[in-house]
Amino acid sequence: MSNSRQHQGHFARKRFGQNFLVDHGVIDSIVATIGPARGQRMVEIGPGLGALTEPLIERLATPESPLHAVELDRDLIGRLQQRFGALLELHAGDALAFDFRSLAAPGDKPSLRIVGNLPYNISSPLLFHLMTFADAVVDQHFMLQNEVVERMVAEPGTKAFSRLSVMLQYRYVMEKMLDVPPESFQPPPKVDSAIVRMIPYEPHELPDVDPVLLGEIVSAAFSQRRKMLRNTLGDYRETIDFDALGFDLARRAEDVSVAEYVGVAQALAAVRKAG
């Protein structure tokens, strides 16, 4: 596979994190994993040159119910509009600022299926942005750097377990689906990639916790991940009775389960509400 940054007459732009998927066998496997069907409300983030867009449109789109796509590169937007016409509704802009809820069906029932080969340089902030729309989402399938996927699905007690692990596992059931080698792209990235499936928990399955407070606790815990929690969470020892929670501070951040972090955030919420 050539290392050229040019593909189909378009130069991949580093500032957009562009690496275009070109392996048709991998594309077929990804589409089979997603399982698109007519009438589904699907959004593709960063369609690029349309490698996934075309088979998705073939399986689900009609002029009355098109595939939606969010794309920042205006050169690509023109090409995609010309190629797919009314079967693709393009939304020009940055996915990090896009209101995905605006594409959801009316009512409270989740309706969006979101897919994409996400730009690796913004993957974590984009995942956190998407989490704010999780109640409107049926599922998400993303191509990401393999290291990021491993962190997303990591178990407590492992080196890969991180702030990203806790915050996403609190909100989603996640599964690594496929490995994708660098040679599947043009130009090939310098890292391995993987497909992850993310299914939001339903409202009745979610713990009753303020995600902002959970994020506050988790960020503090992982701020110096080689230090013990008695140091990183030291500022909270006067407000939270860790002994009453059965929470051992003589551990590192990666040794604590999602449920335990939720318990600490709930305790913090109770103290602040009482105060």
UniProtKB/Swiss-Prot annotation:
Gene Ontology cellular-component terms listed: cytosol
Keywords: Cytoplasm, Methyltransferase, RNA-binding, rRNA processing, S-adenosyl-L-methionine, Transferase
Binding site for S-adenosyl-L-methionine: N19, L21, G46, E71, D94, N117
Catalytic activity: adenosine(1518)/adenosine(1519) in 16S rRNA + 4 S-adenosyl-L-methionine = N(6)-dimethyladenosine(1518)/N(6)-dimethyladenosine(1519) in 16S rRNA + 4 S-adenosyl-L-homocysteine + 4 H(+)
Disulphide bridges, residue numbers: none
UniProt-annotated location(s): Cytoplasm
Entry annotated with the keyword Electron transport: no
Enzyme class: transferase
Record-stated family: Belongs to the class I-like SAM-binding methyltransferase superfamily. rRNA adenine N(6)-methyltransferase family. RsmA subfamily.
The protein's name in its UniProt record: Ribosomal RNA small subunit methyltransferase A
Organism from which the protein derives: Burkholderia cenocepacia (strain ATCC BAA-245 / DSM 16553 / LMG 16656 / NCTC 13227 / J2315 / CF5610)
Gene: rsmA
